Amino acid sequence: MLKKYLLFCLFLFFSFNVYASIWDDIITCLSDPCNCGQSDRTEIWNKGSKYEVKRGPFKPGTLCPPWNKSDGRNNDTCLLQFDYPGTFIGFLLNRCAEEAPDSSYFTPKIRIRVQSCNAAACWHQNSTLNWDGECVLWPTGYGLPLTRVCARVAIPEMNSPSGINASHSYADPGYTEGVHLNKVGYTESDNKIIGVDGQVVTLKSPKLCAYSDPGLVNLISDSGIHLDPMDWNPNRQPLHQTNELSPIAKVLKFLVETVKGFSLPSLLGQLLGMIDPNSEFIKVLQSILNAIGEVFNFFPDLIIKVIEKLGALNSAVDSYSFGCVQLPLGPFPPPYCPNLNAISINPSVNNVCSIKNASGIFDQSSTSPSCVVPSNINVRNNIVNNTIRVSFSNLVPLCTGAKPDLKTCVELRNIDFSSAKITHTKTAFKDLIKSCKNTSGNAACINTEIPTPCSVTANGCNEGFRIVYSQKIGNIETPRDYYIDDIPDCPSSNSTTCQKVWGVNIGEFKDVSIKFPKVQKQDTNSLIPIKTDFTLKDNNGKDRKLYVSISNTEDDKQNPNNICLFESANLIDCVPRVNHSYSLAAYECAKQYAGITCTNNSNPNDAYYKPQFIASLQVREGSNIIDETSTLVTPLSYAGPPPQNPTDTESIVMLAGYQYSSSVAFIPKNPIKDKYIGMPFSGPNALNQLTIHGKYKDDKEPYDSKGNPDLSAIYLKYLEYINGKYIQGGTHACLMPKNFQHCNPMPRPTLSDGAPIPGYNNESINCVLAKVHNNDTINCKDFKNKYNAKYPNLGLCKKDIDLTLCTIEETVPGPRKGITIYTCNINKIPSKCYTNNDNANTPICVLSRDYKDRIKPEPSIGPILVPVDPSKYYTVTYTKGDENTPPEPTYHAETEDVRDKTWQELNLCAPILVPTCAKIPSTAEAPSGQSHGNAEWPESDIGELVKGKCPTNWILIDPNKPLERHCLSYFDRKVVELEPLGHNVGCRKSTGLPIQVVYNDFPSNQLPDTPYNPVTKIGDYFLNKKPVRYGTIMAFPKDGAFINASNEPDNTILHTVVFKVTLDAIMDDIEYFIVEDLWYDDCTLIYVNGTKLLSLPTNVDSLDEKRYCNNGKDQGQALQAKVNNQRISAKNPIDIKPYLKQGENIIKFQLRVMSGGGLYFHMQYKMKR
């Protein structure tokens, strides 16, 4: 027993001592919970230049909301011009522009970056925009408001183009004369061009600028409130806002007012006809007039109103510019040479279609990014199997006239090329047609005498040459690489622009795919850029060795969002990768999905303390997976492998080129009884968003108010994390996408008749409407929309800030004391923060992530919101609004808001192997042993109070100490087992009281009989037989019960029997212990633990000598003992129990026989259980 207690104490000491070391670091966290264990951060913008901007060192507040604050800021990018996000902020939106590495003379581009935060998390997104008005539309913060940034060419101050009767033209708004943005968004002087005479050549060239435009819901942009029903295309906006009518608008207005009866296409055609068709200006102007035409096609009655009332070509655009990048200059004229070498032509890149409509046909509408249909049905373009078209352009027009020169043009045969739509349909939408030399019968083909070689053997020009369509406005016709399915065939009388077959592109092309591996490993060698090498012949017949590549990390040339074309190490062009129509899945290790075996699966305890799971990114066609890539994910844990950087708070994996974090969550079996606990953490047990402790015995905490570990605290259950490292208490491991899967609450825009805009896809399937907690301090709608806009990066003031050194900006009233906004010198930078005047150090307007706090979808649906149907997401609706009031969401923004689905709701959490305390069997024949109290214990979960059960005919040692103990997780030993039992907790055999006859000198045939009945719980002690009647007296029978002392010295003998009764139960467990019958002849004594209970027939203390018994005289008969002057019986017994004690008890019977006699007694006890 003593060894067991010493072992128990040793376990306790070892367990608490090691376990406490984990919480030792917490002492530094209480004073600064947002930064404990984290190193200071330094950010350098425009690094390496003489104008670099350094921020820091400063404390980043990594461990406090919002999560993921450094996303997009770990490299030198334009985002570093902004303050680092604060803690407990309500909303933050940082947007900027920088030079795009793949910008070229033919396709100028600018890169846009955004970092948006809500109270829970931050995300970074980036996109490269083309020069012709391409836009990117992103949700921000909680998803509202939306932000749209568009790229447009800005013209410098210049004289009007030839043919337009207008005065001097001012520069477009936002044009930056003499300066531009470099590759990290820093503003620097324009490059100087030195002429052959050594003098600086002054060029005022157009620039490509990024503009802040309102989104389709017409919310607030950087320059104010906008409302424009004409701004319907989310992907393109080439129009500028000006303060007066532009020269083009003036001419257009004149034509509309004076030239009655003309259709709009004719008007725009006349306008373009006034301009030199060879002018570079027409490239910019044509995209603008196309946009005007699109607006007028839907709103023909508003032509003059649009021109006059909107003041410029479109009032929805914003004059606020994020800056401009230089347009790459074209090649300079070569020096005079008698012979010129063949011009080396760069290959070009085309998007391959990826979205299909309800009919299964690829979407090629004007509201979707332009794309080409794959050359082969087996070619797919998706997030796993990425495909682009790489080509050399060699455009050949259609032949005209009766006798065309087939050495300069092509004829289309067996196809109606007068209709672009019919041509597109007849080619199965691929727009490919073979040479007549390679076809037979009535197959469509091209006839030409121009050589049409093709070295490609699969998925390229071997399938045919590309039909070229052109868009036409008036007399101006422009060949394009793409067919647009909602532009009508030419001629068209009611559309601004039309489309026709222009000719054929006989340059070689190939649809090139890069597929991510089925199993993505995470070692350095496996994360290098993946690429596909191939060779194309250019127009000079020269082999060009090319490759397309996708990177897993962002560098100066490419980022994982793009698929890029290279020749040698030279970047030629990049196009955005497909980032839609996929699903994510998380699988538990036991399933060994994709053939992946978890490294910790052999040991259940390893799987619990350093969990793993399998993440898979899948592309489906119906219910079938057509492409997927999977990887093994190991969330950061104390028991797992150490991170590369000791201060890391997450473990990152790459999947299909995108970053994913992971964490462990507690998802209860019974959501009514227990609460979901997942990162980022909140609530009374959370020190910060990455640190939380579980439940302990007696509601203790693992550390006191000063941060000192409490060695007596015993962990029971629920999730435990320190600074992003998992300890214990999890049930599931979750995949956490870092930069997409966000709620996109855009409403589906409609036309004037209420019909939906063609081609626009509503993506709100990841939205949830949820409660906002702490909403009674101030109006949460104002806090988000007004004060976070007025004070960007507004967060809760830290406890250690000396507010007497800060400046009060304003106090915002509320139902009680409201909040006070300060300007403080935080991290050596003037920053804004607020104090909660009602509840100190408590953030306000906190959006709940608990599914039970959902409003829509209802909590009754359950925590999982996939597979998606309309009942499992929230669609944001808006008020109508007018010219003075922007539309607003119809939900109550004061107490509720829109958020992303959690990882649990997205079903991205896989069960981990949680060990249990194994069942401990125990039977009467094979008890479980002393360490388990000889009891049977059921299988039990960690933290559960387990109730044991004694085997049949076994009883509790101490009925006041119930048979129960906890199933505990011992993190120090990485085991889960039942806690040691306390003193006297356990079972013992129900066999009566343990009795030993330690001395007996009665004749052998008179040995005591001690039967015990486990049913009645009664034990009986019998010695000898009862006397019988002989005539008038009672005497012991002669058949063994009689003791003859006549042959003994002095005719007398003394017999003694001594019993040792060991009581391992408490005294109260004995109902009674009595002598209920006793007969003697001649003298007897009973002693219990040295106390005399009986002396007959006279009162003596000893029978050691003959004279002590009746003065040495024979009694002559057997007499029954009397108690209290009455015969002994069950109702009048000798009560032994009061003289017993815990432990060992000695009961002694003695008999002195004179000549002849004997002793009979019946001693009985009964147990209460």
From Swiss-Prot:
Keywords: Signal. Residues 1-20 form the signal peptide. The keyword Signal applies. The keyword Signal applies. It comes from the Bacteria. This is Uncharacterized protein RP785. It comes from Rickettsia prowazekii (strain Madrid E).
